[in-house]
Regions:
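Conserved dinucleotide-binding and phosphotransfer motif residues
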Residues: 25
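A detector for small-residue-rich transmembrane helices and their helix-helix packing motifs
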Residues: 12-16, 29-46, 58-291
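Short glycine-/aliphatic-rich beta-strand segments at the starts of folded cytosolic domains
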Residues: 1-11
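Short amphipathic alpha-helices in soluble, non-transmembrane regions
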Residues: 18-19, 50-57
Length: 291
C-alpha cells in the first residue's frame, strides 16, 4: 500500500478532524507528525475519493458567509423619544385637569363604531390618552425604548412618523375587528407597532446570510415572544389592540425594507417626517373637538 499526504498543518486539530471524517465514510487514514507538522495520510488508491469527501465536508460546514456589513446607527434616537414622552405627559395633564373646559377623553378615545363611521382621528387621539399614571409611565418607558431602537435604523423623524401611523392603523384594525361598541385608550397600540417594526428591521440588519438560517429570524421571534409576554398581561389589557398594532408595525417595517432598503439619512427629510408627525397629532385633536 502506497500512502500519500492528503492534508498537512502545523496544528493537529484539523488533521484529526479530517481523519474522523474519513473514518466515518470507511476510508482508512492516519495522522503522523514529522518536522513539526502533522500529515493526514491515505492510500493513493482512494486519495481522489478521500479528497472529494473532505471537500464536501468543508463546503457543508463552512461558516455562514455575510454578504454585507451591519448597518451603522443613523440616529441615537433620544430626541424623538424625549418629544414622544413630552407629548404624552402634556396631553395627560390636559386631560386630568379638563383644560380649556374640553372633554379630552370622551372626544379622543378610540370608539370602534365611531371610527368605522368615519371619525378616523380617534385612532390617533386615543394613543395619547391613559387611564392612570402607571399606564402612562409604562407606555412612555417601553415606547421610548422601542422608538430609540427603530430610530437607529431609519432616523428619528421617519421612525416616529412610521410608529404613529402604524399605531393609528392598529387602532383602525382593532375597531374593524370589534365592529360593535368597543372603547380603548393608550399608546400601547403604538408601542407594539414599534416592536413589530423593530422585529422586521432586525431580520434585515444588513446581515444578509448566504443561506437561510434560524439566526436571521431569531430577533423577529424574540419580538413576537415579547408581544406575548408583555402584551397579554393584566385584566384590562386589550390584547387585540396590541396584536393589531404589532401586525401594522410589521407591515410598515416591510414597506421600509422593500421600498427603501436602507435608512433615511437625509437630514431635511427627517425634519419633514418629524413635523408631519406633530402636525398629524394636532390635526387629529382639532378634529376631535370641532369635527
Amino acid at each position: 500500500m502506497s500512502l500519500c499526504a492528503l492534508f498537512h498543518s502545523a496544528l493537529p486539530a484539523r488533521c484529526y478532524e479530517f481523519n474522523l471524517v474519513l473514518q466515518a465514510v470507511r476510508i482508512d487514514s492516519e495522522v503522523v507528525a514529522s518536522d513539526g507538522r502533522y500529515y493526514l495520510l491515505v492510500d493513493e488508491a482512494v486519495a481522489a475519493e478521500a479528497y472529494s469527501q473532505l471537500k464536501l465536508y468543508v463546503e457543508e460546514n463552512a461558516p455562514e458567509e455575510i454578504l454585507s456589513q451591519p448597518l451603522r446607527p443613523i440616529s441615537k434616537g433620544f430626541a424623538g423619544a424625549y418629544l414622544y414622552g413630552l407629548v404624552l405627559l402634556i396631553i395627560g395633564a390636559l386631560k386630568s385637569t379638563n383644560a380649556l373646559n374640553l372633554h379630552w377623553q370622551i372626544n379622543g378615545l378610540a370608539h370602534s363604531v365611531k371610527i368605522m363611521q368615519g371619525e378616523w382621528w380617534r385612532t390617533i387621539t386615543a394613543l395619547a390618552l391613559h387611564a392612570d399614571a402607571a399606564h402612562l409611565a409604562g407606555n412612555i418607558g417601553f415606547g421610548a425604548l422601542f422608538g430609540i431602537l427603530v430610530s437607529q435604523y431609519i432616523g428619528s423623524g421617519a421612525a416616529w412618523f412610521t410608529i404613529l401611523v402604524a399605531g393609528a392603523l392598529g387602532n383602525g384594525l382593532n375597531a374593524d375587528w370589534y365592529q360593535t361598541t368597543h372603547l380603548s385608550i393608550g399608546a400601547s397600540t403604538m408601542v407594539f407597532a414599534a416592536l413589530g417594526i423593530l422585529g422586521v428591521f432586525a431580520i434585515n440588519n444588513g446581515q444578509n446570510y448566504s443561506r437561510a438560517h434560524f439566526r436571521r429570524w431569531a430577533p423577529f421571534i424574540a419580538t413576537f415572544a415579547l408581544l406575548g409576554f408583555i402584551g397579554t398581561a393584566g385584566e384590562r389589557t386589550d390584547i387585540m389592540a396590541h396584536l393589531s398594532g404589532y401586525i401594522c408595525g410589521c407591515l410598515s417595517g416591510i414597506v421600509w425594507v422593500f421600498l427603501l432598503r436602507r435608512g433615511f439619512e437625509n437630514i431635511p427629510a427627517q425634519y419633514v417626517f418629524g413635523l408631519a408627525s406633530i402636525a398629524l397629532v394636532c390635526l387629529a385633536w382639532v378634529l376631535a373637538f370641532v369635527g
